[in-house]
């Protein structure tokens, strides 16, 4: 019995939660699962303060007292609208990306950091007059559909797209850039049985 407090980052919450919630409830019917959507920064703080038992986040974080157990690697997928310069490419390469025509999540989202790190390797200048950052992946897709640029999506977020929007997905040629998603918890965590 008891309570288990789990934090999940916003870009993972809507896709992963429905997949594992029923299984958890069946396996631990006496445990009250309390789930919070938090940024990575908030998660780290709350794990260190003892206010969270575990979290699901993009890793590696490499934080001394936090243990990371990799759950899966989630590929990035290009979302390229019909009016974009890359629309006719069957597969895309990291070298095709230009930070100046990309729609990004706002600061504080680790998925944004992953995309920026990908683009940094290209050393492209950031001198465009228009730059937009949004708090939601759904908004990035809507803005791309309006011709405001392209975006990258975590693979699990592509599964809920409408059929019409699925046509705008362009996968990377191997090796595909991906994010590591892990279960993270304090090394001294006492609820290790549930974590396992």
What would you call each of these model-derived segments?
Residues 2-28, 32-37, 41-45, 114, ...:
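N-terminal winged-helix
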Residues 16, 168-196:
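A late-sequence structural motif
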Residues 19-23, 40-76, 80, 140, ...:
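Short beta-strand-centered segments that line the small-molecule binding cleft or hinge
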Residues 32-39, 58-59, 125-136:
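Short beta-strand-to-loop elements that line the ligand-binding cleft
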Residues 38, 52-58, 135, 152-154, ...:
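Short beta-strand and adjacent tight-turn residues that come in two discontinuous sequence segments
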Residues 65-102:
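Flexible hinge/capping segments at coil-to-helix
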Residues 67-77, 129, 151, 155-158, ...:
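Short beta-strand->loop
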Residues 101-123, 155, 191-192:
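Secondary-structure junction motif
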């Amino acid at each position: 019995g008891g309570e288990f407090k789990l934090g999940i980052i916003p870009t993972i919450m809507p896709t992963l939660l429905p997949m594992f919630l029923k299984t958890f409830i069946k396996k631990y019917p006496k445990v009250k699962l309390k789930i919070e959507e938090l940024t990575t920064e908030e998660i780290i703080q709350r794990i260190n303060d003892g206010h969270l038992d575990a979290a699901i986040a993009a890793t590696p974080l490499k934080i001394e007292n936090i243990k990371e157990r990799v759950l899966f690697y989630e590929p990035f997928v290009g979302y390229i609208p019909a009016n974009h310069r890359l629309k006719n490419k069957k597969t895309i390469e990291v070298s095709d990306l230009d930070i100046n025509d990309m729609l990004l999540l706002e600061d504080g989202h680790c998925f944004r950091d992953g995309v920026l790190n990908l683009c940094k390797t290209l050393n492209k200048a950031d001198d465009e007059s228009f730059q937009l950052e949004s708090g939601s992946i759904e908004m990035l897709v809507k803005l791309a559909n309006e011709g405001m640029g392209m975006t990258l999506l975590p693979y699990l977020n592509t599964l809920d797209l409408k059929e019409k929007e699925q046509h705008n997905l362009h996968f990377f040629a191997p090796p595909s850039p991906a994010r590591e998603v892990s279960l993270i918890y304090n090394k001294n965590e006492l609820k290790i049985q549930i974590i396992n």
